[in-house]
A protein has these predicted regions:
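Bacterial N-terminal signal peptides that target proteins for export
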Residues: 1-8
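N-terminal signal peptide c-region/cleavage motif recognized by signal peptidases
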Residues: 14-17
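Charge-biased low-complexity segments
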Residues: 19-275
Length: 275
């Protein structure tokens, strides 16, 4: 699916640049938006309906892409007392536009995340002091999102913290991007190791549980950007080195804030679609 979005092109051109030699990096720049909503799943795992939050603020082309593919999704049936059960779940979806030539973009559904609880019901944040924004990044105008994943004991203390991925909203050399990713990841992980979480409501009594917690470093972006394209350079995804953690893909579909327990999500069995 190729769509011309003048606003996307203007945004990609306006992405802050810190280097003269950045051709290969510019080719990797993407624009994306993360949308939230609900999805109704029948007992057999088929989609019986869905709704996107604040749909009037979402580009019609994006809504059309979702309408084309979401109804065809199929999930692993949810079992309750040994019986398949219909369920309304909460979802977040990342739609990505990647430049193809001078005036076209390939638009696709990159990631999706599904949860049985609304974001506000996924536990209380407890003691989660935000990380310090690295001064060097502020001076250089570098912003981005660090997708942290933490392993928590039954007392709510963080046992392990790991940065799965760091996406940056800046153009720079490959070397500089790697340095900025490392700097922001270190800041996020330093804070994450001091966090305290309440008991995971879905797994009382478990010795440990795992959650994804995105950390957004933003300069002057306090406005609501829901339904708007945002340009960034995606970083590589690295799963945590812990054994026994079931991850349904990377963290890219998660909103920029919140606590998202891992291992209790609904499992999508079919491709997401879009290209």
């Amino acid at each position: 699916m190729r769509i011309w979005f003048g606003c996307i092109l203007a945004m990609l051109v306006a992405l802050p640049a810190l280097a003269q030699e950045r051709g290969p990096v510019r080719d990797r720049v993407e624009a994306s938006m993360v949308l939230t909503g609900t999805i109704d799943i029948a007992a057999d795992g088929k989609v019986s309906g869905y709704a996107i939050d604040r749909a009037a603020e979402v580009p019609t082309g994006v809504l059309g892409l979702l309408a084309r593919f979401v109804p065809g999704w199929r999930f692993e049936p949810l079992m309750v007392d040994g019986q398949p059960t219909a369920k309304r779940a909460y979802m977040s979806v990342r739609v990505v536009a990647k430049r193809q030539g001078e005036d076209a973009f390939a638009v696709s559904i990159r990631n999706a995340s599904f949860h049985q609880q609304a974001p506000g019901q996924r536990g209380t944040k407890g003691n989660m002091r935000p990380p310090r924004y690295p001064h060097a990044a502020i001076r250089a105008g570098v912003s981005g999102t660090v997708y942290t994943i933490v392993r928590i004991d039954r007392d709510g203390r963080v046992l392990d913290a790991f940065a799965e991925q760091v996406d940056l909203r800046v153009l720079a050399s490959e070397y500089a991007l790697a340095r900025w990713r490392e700097l922001m990841a270190d800041a996020a992980l330093h804070a994450a190791r001091q966090w305290y979480f309440p008991e995971h409501p879905d797994a009382p009594g478990d010795d440990t549980w795992v959650a994804r917690v995105p950390v957004d470093f933003a300069i002057g972006r306090g406005e609501d950007r829901y339904g708007q394209w945002q340009a960034y350079v995606p970083g590589p995804w690295q799963p945590p080195p812990w054994t026994g953690v079931r991850l349904a893909g990377g963290p890219g579909a998660l909103p920029a804030s919140g606590i998202f327990p891992v291992g209790h999500d609904l499992q999508l069995l079919t491709p997401m679609g879009g290209q």
